[in-house]
Amino acid sequence: TSSAILKNEPSNRTSSIIAVNLNIDKRDSIIKPKRGYIVSLTSKYAGLGGNREYSKSTGKGRIYFPLITDSIVVSSEIEAGALSMNNGTSTASERFYLGGRTLRGFQYGGVGPRDLTVNESLGGTNYTVGRAEVSFPLGLPKELNMYGGVFGELGKVWGLDATVPPGTNVNLDDSIRSS
Protein backbone atom coordinates (compact mmCIF):
# COMPACT_ATOMS: atom_id res chain seq x y z
CA THR A 1 0.00 0.00 0.00
CA SER A 2 1.01 3.59 -0.57
CA SER A 3 1.27 6.45 1.90
CA ALA A 4 -1.99 8.33 2.56
CA ILE A 5 -0.01 11.54 2.01
CA LEU A 6 0.94 10.43 -1.50
CA LYS A 7 -2.60 9.21 -2.24
CA ASN A 8 -3.96 12.67 -1.35
CA GLU A 9 -1.75 14.41 -3.92
CA PRO A 10 -3.52 15.79 -6.99
CA SER A 11 -3.62 13.15 -9.72
CA ASN A 12 -4.03 15.56 -12.62
CA ARG A 13 -0.90 17.74 -12.69
CA THR A 14 0.60 19.68 -15.54
CA SER A 15 3.52 22.07 -15.54
CA SER A 16 5.69 24.04 -17.89
CA ILE A 17 9.24 24.50 -16.67
CA ILE A 18 11.95 26.90 -17.72
CA ALA A 19 15.47 26.17 -16.45
CA VAL A 20 18.80 27.96 -16.35
CA ASN A 21 22.10 26.07 -15.87
CA LEU A 22 25.56 27.41 -15.13
CA ASN A 23 28.51 25.02 -15.31
CA ILE A 24 32.13 25.98 -14.69
CA ASP A 25 34.79 23.28 -15.09
CA LYS A 26 38.38 24.20 -14.23
CA ARG A 27 39.73 20.68 -13.61
CA ASP A 28 43.06 19.64 -15.13
CA SER A 29 41.44 16.42 -16.42
CA ILE A 30 37.85 15.24 -16.78
CA ILE A 31 38.88 11.58 -16.33
CA LYS A 32 41.27 11.62 -13.35
CA PRO A 33 41.49 15.20 -12.02
CA LYS A 34 44.31 16.14 -9.64
CA ARG A 35 43.73 19.88 -9.40
CA GLY A 36 40.94 22.34 -10.00
CA TYR A 37 37.24 22.65 -9.37
CA ILE A 38 33.85 22.17 -10.96
CA VAL A 39 30.69 24.12 -10.12
CA SER A 40 27.14 23.51 -11.31
CA LEU A 41 24.10 25.68 -10.54
CA THR A 42 20.56 25.03 -11.76
CA SER A 43 17.41 27.05 -11.24
CA LYS A 44 13.98 25.95 -12.48
CA TYR A 45 10.69 27.79 -12.51
CA ALA A 46 7.38 26.02 -13.10
CA GLY A 47 4.28 28.13 -13.64
CA LEU A 48 4.28 29.41 -17.19
CA GLY A 49 1.46 27.00 -17.95
CA GLY A 50 -0.32 24.15 -16.21
CA ASN A 51 -1.48 23.94 -12.61
CA ARG A 52 1.90 23.69 -10.79
CA GLU A 53 3.85 26.77 -9.73
CA TYR A 54 7.20 26.52 -7.95
CA SER A 55 10.88 27.44 -7.96
CA LYS A 56 13.54 24.76 -7.52
CA SER A 57 17.27 25.43 -7.26
CA THR A 58 20.28 23.15 -6.84
CA GLY A 59 23.98 23.78 -6.61
CA LYS A 60 27.08 21.62 -6.45
CA GLY A 61 30.77 22.44 -6.13
CA ARG A 62 33.78 20.10 -5.99
CA ILE A 63 37.46 20.91 -5.52
CA TYR A 64 40.47 18.66 -6.24
CA PHE A 65 44.01 18.99 -4.91
CA PRO A 66 47.05 16.72 -4.52
CA LEU A 67 48.17 15.63 -1.05
CA ILE A 68 51.90 15.02 -0.51
CA THR A 69 52.38 13.83 -4.13
CA ASP A 70 50.40 14.17 -7.37
CA SER A 71 49.33 10.52 -7.11
CA ILE A 72 47.31 11.07 -3.90
CA VAL A 73 44.31 13.31 -4.61
CA VAL A 74 41.80 14.78 -2.18
CA SER A 75 38.40 15.90 -3.41
CA SER A 76 35.74 17.68 -1.41
CA GLU A 77 32.20 18.47 -2.52
CA ILE A 78 29.14 20.27 -1.24
CA GLU A 79 25.69 20.02 -2.80
CA ALA A 80 22.36 21.58 -1.81
CA GLY A 81 18.87 22.20 -3.11
CA ALA A 82 15.67 24.03 -2.20
CA LEU A 83 12.09 23.83 -3.47
CA SER A 84 9.68 26.71 -2.91
CA MET A 85 6.02 26.37 -3.83
CA ASN A 86 4.35 29.54 -5.11
CA ASN A 87 0.91 28.04 -4.53
CA GLY A 88 -0.24 24.74 -3.06
CA THR A 89 1.97 22.04 -1.61
CA SER A 90 4.72 20.03 -3.25
CA THR A 91 4.22 16.56 -4.71
CA ALA A 92 6.49 13.54 -4.36
CA SER A 93 7.92 14.02 -7.85
CA GLU A 94 8.88 17.64 -7.08
CA ARG A 95 10.61 16.95 -3.74
CA PHE A 96 14.23 15.88 -3.12
CA TYR A 97 15.41 12.39 -2.11
CA LEU A 98 18.80 11.14 -0.91
CA GLY A 99 20.31 7.67 -0.89
CA GLY A 100 21.77 5.28 -3.43
CA ARG A 101 24.13 7.24 -5.69
CA THR A 102 23.32 10.56 -3.98
CA LEU A 103 24.32 9.41 -0.46
CA ARG A 104 26.29 6.16 -0.45
CA GLY A 105 25.45 3.69 2.29
CA PHE A 106 21.70 4.40 2.20
CA GLN A 107 19.02 3.09 -0.12
CA TYR A 108 17.44 5.66 -2.44
CA GLY A 109 14.96 7.69 -0.40
CA GLY A 110 16.44 6.29 2.82
CA VAL A 111 17.12 9.73 4.32
CA GLY A 112 14.50 12.34 5.20
CA PRO A 113 10.76 12.53 5.92
CA ARG A 114 9.09 9.14 5.96
CA ASP A 115 5.57 7.74 6.43
CA LEU A 116 6.18 5.12 9.11
CA THR A 117 2.67 3.70 8.70
CA VAL A 118 3.72 2.10 5.38
CA ASN A 119 7.51 2.72 5.60
CA GLU A 120 7.57 4.97 2.54
CA SER A 121 9.90 7.87 1.78
CA LEU A 122 8.11 11.20 1.25
CA GLY A 123 11.03 13.38 0.16
CA GLY A 124 11.70 16.90 1.36
CA THR A 125 11.76 20.47 0.13
CA ASN A 126 15.43 20.97 1.06
CA TYR A 127 18.60 18.91 1.06
CA THR A 128 22.32 19.24 1.62
CA VAL A 129 25.19 16.80 1.12
CA GLY A 130 28.90 16.99 1.87
CA ARG A 131 31.44 14.56 0.45
CA ALA A 132 35.18 14.02 0.90
CA GLU A 133 37.35 11.46 -0.85
CA VAL A 134 41.02 10.53 -1.05
CA SER A 135 42.24 8.42 -3.98
CA PHE A 136 45.65 6.79 -4.01
CA PRO A 137 47.67 4.30 -6.07
CA LEU A 138 47.49 0.66 -5.02
CA GLY A 139 51.07 -0.13 -6.03
CA LEU A 140 49.95 -2.17 -9.04
CA PRO A 141 51.40 -1.65 -12.54
CA LYS A 142 50.36 1.76 -13.94
CA GLU A 143 48.89 0.10 -17.05
CA LEU A 144 46.10 -1.35 -14.87
CA ASN A 145 45.05 2.19 -13.90
CA MET A 146 43.63 0.99 -10.56
CA TYR A 147 43.39 3.24 -7.54
CA GLY A 148 42.15 2.83 -4.00
CA GLY A 149 39.90 5.29 -2.29
CA VAL A 150 38.50 6.30 1.06
CA PHE A 151 35.38 8.44 1.28
CA GLY A 152 33.01 9.97 3.75
CA GLU A 153 29.60 11.48 3.06
CA LEU A 154 26.98 13.22 5.12
CA GLY A 155 23.64 14.67 4.22
CA LYS A 156 20.10 15.42 5.20
CA VAL A 157 16.69 16.02 3.64
CA TRP A 158 14.11 18.12 5.43
CA GLY A 159 10.94 20.11 4.95
CA LEU A 160 7.64 18.42 4.19
CA ASP A 161 4.85 20.81 3.25
CA ALA A 162 2.19 18.12 2.69
CA THR A 163 -0.97 17.79 4.77
CA VAL A 164 -0.70 14.78 7.08
CA PRO A 165 -4.01 12.87 7.31
CA PRO A 166 -5.17 11.64 10.74
CA GLY A 167 -3.78 8.21 11.64
CA THR A 168 -0.64 8.71 9.57
CA ASN A 169 2.62 8.36 11.49
CA VAL A 170 5.20 10.65 9.86
CA ASN A 171 8.84 10.83 10.92
CA LEU A 172 10.17 14.31 10.18
CA ASP A 173 13.60 13.53 11.66
CA ASP A 174 16.01 15.85 9.89
CA SER A 175 19.18 14.46 11.44
CA ILE A 176 22.38 14.52 9.46
CA ARG A 177 23.18 11.01 8.20
CA SER A 178 26.69 9.86 7.36
CA SER A 179 28.56 7.02 5.72
Mark where each language-model region is.
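Transmembrane beta-barrel wall of Gram-negative outer-membrane proteins
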Residues: 1-8
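Conserved helix-loop functional segments at active or binding sites
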Residues: 24-31, 134-138
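C-terminal transmembrane beta-barrel domains of outer membrane proteins
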Residues: 4, 15-18, 35-179
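Flexible loop and strand-edge segments within Gram-negative outer membrane beta-barrel domains
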Residues: 11-12
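Alpha-helical scaffold segments in soluble metabolic enzymes
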Residues: 21
